[in-house]
Amino acid sequence: MRKDSKLSRMLHVLLHMAREDKPFTSDYISEMLETNPVVVRRTMSGLKKHGFVDSEKGPGGGWTLIKSLSDISLYDVYVAVGEPSIFAIGNENKQPDCLVELVVNQALDQAFIEAQQLLINNLKSTKLDKLAHDFQVEWDRHIADKQSQLT
């Protein structure tokens, strides 16, 4: 089963947009993500609907970030991309006749609910400015390593 990568891809795009003070065209984003510009426009429209980006048509136009990274949580973006399913596993039969299957389903359902709530809480508490900071730390470390290799 293929993983849904809309969340990570849009987080990737938003962080790049925050670093560069220019509009990003759908073509530019599609090249970055190695996908179709139509897919980009469809997904970015969800971010626009939630007030994270805006778009300008015509020459010099494109998508621009209009909300501060400190005001956007991972959960906000998760919602904006359509709340993709978190788990690929589940119960085959929601109304089993077998009591063994019933208790298995109940145990799994409870575990899934608890795990999903834990993840949702984590997504809500993590702002995009933290990711931007973490990137900067990694970037600085990368540059320092490259410079030390040259000396």
Which residues does each PLM region occupy?
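Beta-hairpin "wing" of winged helix-turn-helix
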Residues: H50-I66
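Extreme N-terminal segment that seeds HTH/winged-HTH DNA-binding domains in transcriptional regulators
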Residues: M1-L33
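C-terminal regulatory/oligomerization modules of transcriptional regulators
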Residues: P96-T151
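Conserved segment of winged-helix/HTH DNA-binding domains
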Residues: L69-K94, F112
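Generic alpha-helical structural context detector
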Residues: H12-L15, Y75-V79, N121
